């Protein structure tokens, strides 16, 4: 979840800055100076949308290090760090990718992988995860993150986010144009304060709605990463036990009726915005691989 949250947050910030700068430069006025020019607006939206997501991808690794305080293990200083390096190296070799950077950061049990390219990625784990899980469970989590890298999930998410950004930028300006025309007393096509306010509000509203699409796609990729981890480890059992540990289930039991235990990342409406599927669904999917 941390990986997706950082990417989306950075993307939103980049899009917001680009929108403000381009508005100050008069690009919005140029597009609508002779009426609403939809083809030109679409090109503008594509450029802004994909530029924002690509910039977010390119800076994802340094942003992740900075925001989490992650420390890259250059020279292992303990047996745990040496084990982490050896384990990630082994998993990366199995997955057919180059050795990622390995980092540790202080925090609750969590892990993430990020980076613009498959062969220059970062895999990070929290101290909380290392302290609360067995080595087999940590290895399963690492396999899950390596699978994300091998699947090219960050690049795929960039493409999805770019398309989503395009529609958000496009639709917000179309709505802004018509609202401005409806409340404006001028017959010319100059933009008023109504346009600016409507575009800002629309980008926020459409951006929130679009995040549901991004979150849905992210949940789909999590199932694939779980399956990838099972393949790397030769069995789905370690990943099932790691997920059970994260969900607060006794990992040695793994009962069939997981739903009755109330394990869910985000219940109800909030589940639409969750980047991860419910843990019981992920374990059920892994069980089907046996």
Curated annotation (Swiss-Prot):
EC number assigned by the record: 3.4.24.-
Active site as annotated: 145
UniProt similarity note: Belongs to the peptidase M48B family.
One GO CC annotation: plasma membrane
Membrane topology: Multi-pass membrane protein
Cofactor binding annotation: Binds 1 zinc ion per subunit.
Gene Ontology BP, a term: proteolysis
This protein's name: Protease HtpX homolog
Cofactor: Zn(2+)
Domain of life: Bacteria
């Amino acid at each position: 979840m941390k990986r997706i949250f950082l990417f989306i947050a950075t993307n939103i910030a980049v899009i917001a800055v680009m929108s403000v700068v381009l508005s100050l430069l008069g690009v919005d006025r140029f597009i609508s100076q002779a009426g609403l020019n939809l083809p030109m607006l679409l090109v503008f939206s594509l450029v802004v949308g994909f530029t924002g997501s690509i910039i977010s991808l390119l800076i994802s690794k340094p942003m992740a290090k900075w925001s989490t305080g992650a420390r890259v293990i250059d020279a292992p200083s303990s047996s745990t760090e040496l084990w982490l390096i050896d384990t990630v190296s082994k998993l990366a070799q199995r997955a057919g990718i180059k050795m990622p950077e390995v980092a540790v950061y202080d925090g609750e049990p969590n892990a993430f992988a990020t980076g613009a390219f498959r062969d220059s990625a970062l895999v990070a784990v929290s101290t909380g995860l290392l302290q609360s899980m067995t080595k087999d469970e940590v290895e399963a989590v690492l396999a899950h993150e390596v699978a994300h890298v091998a699947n090219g999930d960050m690049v795929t998410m960039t493409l999805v986010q770019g398309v989503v950004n395009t529609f958000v930028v496009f639709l917000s300006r179309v709505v802004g144009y018509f609202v401005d025309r409806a409340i404006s007393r001028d017959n010319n096509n100059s933009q008023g304060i109504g346009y600016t306010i409507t575009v800002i509000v629309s980008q926020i509203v459409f951006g929130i709605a679009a995040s549901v699409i991004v979150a849905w796609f992210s949940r789909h990729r999590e199932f694939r990463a779980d399956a990838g981890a099972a393949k790397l480890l030769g069995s789905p059992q370690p990943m099932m036990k790691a997920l059970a540990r994260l969900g607060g289930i006794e990992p040695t039991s793994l009962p069939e009726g997981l739903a009755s235990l109330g394990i869910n990342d985000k219940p109800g409406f909030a589940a639409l915005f969750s980047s991860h599927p419910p843990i019981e669904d992920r374990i059920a999917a892994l069980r089907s691989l046996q």
